[in-house]
Amino acid sequence: MTAQQAQRFPGTGLQWSLGLIALILAACLISDGLSGGPQLSLPLLLAGALSWLVCWIGVPRLRALKMGQVIRQEGPQSHQSKSGTPTMGGLLLVPCGVVVGSLVSPGDPRLLPIGLVTLAFMVIGGIDDWRSLTKRHNTGLTPKGKLLLQALAAGLFLLWAGLHGAIPTAIALPWGWLLPIGLLIWPLGLFVFLAESNATNLTDGLDGLAAGVGAIVLVGLSLQLMLRGNGGDPALAGYGAALAGAWLGFLLHNRHPARVFMGDTGSLAMGAALSAIALLSNSLWPLLLMGGLLLAESLSVILQVWVFKATKGADGQGKRLLRMAPLHHHFELGGWSERRVVVSFWGISLLLVALGLVLVP
């Protein structure tokens, strides 16, 4: 495919973003109609409007503070034109989702720790972004340093969950099956936080990609929580919808061509929020399935490195499984336009969510 052909992908970034928002809102309204109240649509709309407004006010401020993204030289050369686009947009959107989500069921004790761990990962990502900006190079915290801080925040959340009996000891699977894991939930929970937050971080490489995929998965988790027996779990479902709304409001500023990037500030917080909601609601299986695209992005990096090292010769050169990792760059270098990659990945995530809803535990 030539560059000219790649640009023929129909529609604009705004049109596709509005279409995704309309589709997600319709799904929430259908769920609300079945449950008898605006348990998903209201927090989705409130957080979305608040996030859009805060970003509309805050993005020019980020630009004035010269908080422009430093683009790594190893990435696609077409991305060099994005250099200088304001980053750390997570500072604007994440608090919007947390605040609105906390108002869904103020008396539910689970919402505060979810909000705190989400904000903690936002701060970790913010430190990473800030160090990258001050050094004027796309490297912030050391990988070990970042992982240690993430593990500390996740560990404190898991400790709270364990002390309050809020952490499952058996994983709910489709068709009523349960997988007893006992104390293994502790290392598994830690792994979920680290893997999910870094998966969302890797996915945040194209305009609107992570924001759209993250919102889709968050709403998917919320919908399956409402479909469960005994009235579902409206508190966590509404919280997830609020967070999804915050990322959708941000998406209107982050869609191609992006006015702002969420940075690690937003992507790490997204992974933490997904992990916390999934763990407290025993939705690890739905998260694995619905977030399959996030998993694919992570695996693409792992496999790329493994193949290169396994085939590396004396000259230091090895073979590559993909043109470039993560996976979205592989399609970019294959001639796909950025918008085509993003919309296609959104579509895959929507299909995975639909499959996950069929297989609700």
UniProtKB/Swiss-Prot annotation:
Pathway per its UniProt entry is: Cell wall biogenesis; peptidoglycan biosynthesis
Catalyzes what?
A: UDP-N-acetyl-alpha-D-muramoyl-L-alanyl-gamma-D-glutamyl-meso-2,6-diaminopimeloyl-D-alanyl-D-alanine + di-trans,octa-cis-undecaprenyl phosphate = di-trans,octa-cis-undecaprenyl diphospho-N-acetyl-alpha-D-muramoyl-L-alanyl-D-glutamyl-meso-2,6-diaminopimeloyl-D-alanyl-D-alanine + UMP
What cofactor requirement does the entry state? Mg(2+)
Enzyme class name: transferase
In terms of Pfam families, this protein maps to:
Glycos_transf_4, MraY_sig1
Family matches, as InterPro entries:
Glycosyl_transferase_4, PNAcMuramoyl-5peptid_Trfase, PNAcMuramoyl-5peptid_Trfase_CS
Listed GO CC annotations: plasma membrane
Q: Which UniProt keywords apply?
A: Cell cycle, Cell division, Cell inner membrane, Cell membrane, Cell shape, Cell wall biogenesis/degradation, Magnesium, Membrane, Metal-binding, Peptidoglycan synthesis, Transferase, Transmembrane, Transmembrane helix
* Subcellular location as annotated: Cell inner membrane
Q: Name one GO biological process term.
A: cell division
Where does the protein principally reside?
A: membrane
EC number, as in UniProt: 2.7.8.13
Q: Which CDD domains match?
A: GT_MraY
Q: What's its membrane topology?
A: Multi-pass membrane protein
- Name it: Phospho-N-acetylmuramoyl-pentapeptide-transferase
Species name = Synechococcus sp. (strain RCC307)
